[in-house]
Amino acid sequence: MAIYAVGDLQGCYREFRELLDLVRFDETKDKLWLVGDLVNRGPDSLSVLRFVKELNDSAIMVLGNHDLHLLLVAEGCAELSRSDTLQNILDAPDRDELLDWLRRQKLLHVDGNYVMVHAGLLPSWSIEQAQVLAALVESALRGSEFHEFCRQMYGNRPDHWNETLHGYERLRVIVNAMTRMRVCTPHGRMDFAHKGSVKDIPPGYLPWFDVPERASRKATVICGHWSALGLEIRANLMALDTGCLWGGSLTAVRLEDRKVFQTECGAGGATRHWQ
């Protein structure tokens, strides 16, 4: 059995299937770990959702900001933007089944020393604490107060963690860290405006994974979300968003030996790269 961690799909269904062919994925014995943002901006989010859902236990995903955006739009708590490509999901005959499945997915996945999250973890959060906090959001997504949670989810404040936070402010910070964060201060104050490269990070901020002595540093965190960062693999980090949507590549890493496989997006074929 092999486990393949795969970067942000964002509706790039053709490239996703090419990548699975490239690694010779066998759903009867292999596993896919998907870092979130299955949908939006790409051409075929509906096929991505249907395919991953049908994989059942052969695929594990964590929710990304675009996946949550789909849920909010469907619930009437957010508007479609010009760049959104979610209408075919909203119009699909199996819409309700797909959305119900999506809202029951994880925000955080932990397996041994591997931790998968879409964006990142705040510096003060241990893996154990992050699991507890993610479970709060997962419960809110699946519970009877789902609509109100959707109404309250969006917002940039509070922009840092405080143990005294409660209610929807507490949930909002957890969602923002795990699905939106790229950079923060050493004390964990997040900046959501920066989407560029590491060299352009605002003064006083740094990549969340570079904060000295962050509490999760002994685990290997698998994440996506930051396409301008590109592929970043370290002993304790696998950042896998390589910008397929923007003409980059779609990346998979086989966890057992850390071999990298990539489909070049928009280049008319799949190319294998090793690392």
UniProtKB/Swiss-Prot annotation:
It is an enzyme of class 3 (hydrolase). SUPFAM superfamilies: Metallo-dependent phosphatases (SSF56300). Keywords: Hydrolase. One of its GO terms (molecular function) is bis(5'-nucleosyl)-tetraphosphatase (symmetrical) activity. Gene3D superfamilies: 3.60.21.10. Pfam families: Metallophos. Its EC number is 3.6.1.41. It catalyses: P(1),P(4)-bis(5'-adenosyl) tetraphosphate + H2O = 2 ADP + 2 H(+). Hydrolyzes diadenosine 5',5'''-P1,P4-tetraphosphate to yield ADP. Belongs to the Ap4A hydrolase family. This is Bis(5'-nucleosyl)-tetraphosphatase, symmetrical. It comes from Nitrosospira multiformis (strain ATCC 25196 / NCIMB 11849 / C 71). The lineage of its organism: Bacteria, Pseudomonadati, Pseudomonadota, Betaproteobacteria, Nitrosomonadales.
